[in-house]
Amino acid sequence: AEAIQSMMRSASGQQQLIGPIIVQPYTHIYWKETENKTTREEETVYEYILPEKLNIQGNLQVTPRQLGIYKAQVYKTRLSFTGSFPTQRAVKSSEQLIPQTAYLTFLLSDARGINSVPELQLGEELIAFAPGSNMNNKAGIHAPLNSSNLSDGNFKIELDLQGMESLAIAPVGRDTQYHLQGNWPHPNFIGDFLPTQHTSEQNGFAADWQTSWFATDMEQKFGNYAATEYDQNLPTFNVSLIQPVDQYQLNERAAKYALLFIGLTFVSFFMFEVLKGLRVHPV
């Protein structure tokens, strides 16, 4: 509905999160032949390092908002991401590939929903995030890294997030576990993977997901050393906060059915007069 879209424009909309991912950019130098001459060209290519293990915990606190007769579910949540990145890796360097500064990135569909400045704990070091995902102007946050940061792959990130209607998270870990609970009694579990277990009661819900790269094919979706960044069609864990049928919807349906029955009655009389040549009413 237009009212819901208006509320999303003035606050924050549906949220989809992709991350955390370590991105190692390289300057790729190559030679190109054009019109009988050879020119030196450069492009940026990317290597993606995905978590070995990723554990996500979230608590969704939903507050219904209303605009006119329309309602939308606005939520706030603190998402905790813990896990580890592989540490046994070598940054490639040659005449054709020159490494740039690596960074850890999080992509969000609506960065307006970030309520506080998050920090990355990588090993024993705290690193502040900067605005922007640093990936082709996509919304999100990123934290620059160096060789000392990458020596310890254990990480922890806490993200305070606001959104509306739904929350989707891409399981980027080799092994991903996700627990989400909330105070909304009507969750709708959609996305590419259903919860392995869930409960829904009047005072809220709880759900658990678990998957691996064997099911998500996530490693293939992040092709390394390519100028294109990644496959946009990533699988997600997704929960939608649906609104049960309310009195306004019942009244709207009743009015539409009333118009339908009245219209069908007049059409029936009209067809009877046309086909039979008889007047139903003497006037």
Please name every model-derived segment:
Residues 237-247:
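Juxtamembrane membrane-water interface segments that cap and precede transmembrane helices
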